[in-house]
Amino acid sequence: MAVSRALALRLAYAAAGALMGFSAFFTWSLAPAFRQPATAAAGGLSGVLALWALITHVMYVQDYWRTWLKGLRFFLFIGILFSALSVVGFCTFLVLAITQHQSLTDPRSYYLSCVWSFISLKWAFLLSLYAYRYRNEFADISILSDF
C-alpha cells in the first residue's frame, strides 16, 4: 500500500509523540531535580498510547488490518478505556494541585501531571479514532471478521 502524505504525517506525528512521552517518563523518573512519579506515569502512558497509534498506522500500511478486524475493535476499546483513565487522572491531579496550593512553574507540581494526562487523553482519543476509521474502511470484508 502506498503511503499518502497525510498518512506519512500521521506516522511522523505518532513517532514524535512516542519519543516525547518516553522522554518525559525518563526525565521525571530518573532526574533527581524533577522526580515526580505522577508526571512520569502520565508521560509514560502518553508515550505508550502514541506508540500504539504508530503501530496502528504501520499495520495499516502493511495491510495487516484487512485480515484482523477484531484487533481494530480491541484497539478501539483500549483507546476508550485509556481516555476514561486519562480524564480521571486529569481531574485528580488538578484537584490535588489546587488543594495543595502548588505553583504552576514548579517542575514537581501536579499541574505538569495534568498536562501529561491531557496529552494521554489526546493520544487515547486518536488511537480510538484511527481504529474506528480503519475498521470502517475494511468493514466491507465482513467474511474475514470471524478470524
UniProtKB/Swiss-Prot annotation:
Signal peptide start and end residues: none
Keywords in alphabetical order: Cytoplasmic vesicle, Endosome, Lysosome, Membrane, Transmembrane, Transmembrane helix, Transport
Record's bilayer topology term: Multi-pass membrane protein
GO biological process, any: heme transport
Annotated catalysed reactions: heme b(in) = heme b(out)
Segments carrying motif Di-leucine motif: 143-144
GO cellular component: endosome membrane; lysosomal membrane; phagocytic vesicle membrane; plasma membrane
Chain segments annotated as transmembrane: 11-31, 41-61, 74-94, 111-131
Cell location: Endosome membrane; Lysosome membrane; Cytoplasmic vesicle, Phagosome membrane
Family from the record: Belongs to the HRG family.
Protein name as annotated: Heme transporter HRG1
Gene that this sequence comes from: SLC48A1
Role: Heme transporter that regulates intracellular heme availability through the endosomal or lysosomal compartment. In macrophages of the reticuloendothelial system, is the heme transporter for heme-iron recycling. Essential for macrophage iron homeostasis, transports heme from the phagolysosome to the cytoplasm during erythrophagocytosis (EP).
Record carries keyword Membrane: yes
InterPro entries: HRG
Keyword set includes DNA repair: no
GO molecular function annotation: heme binding; heme transmembrane transporter activity
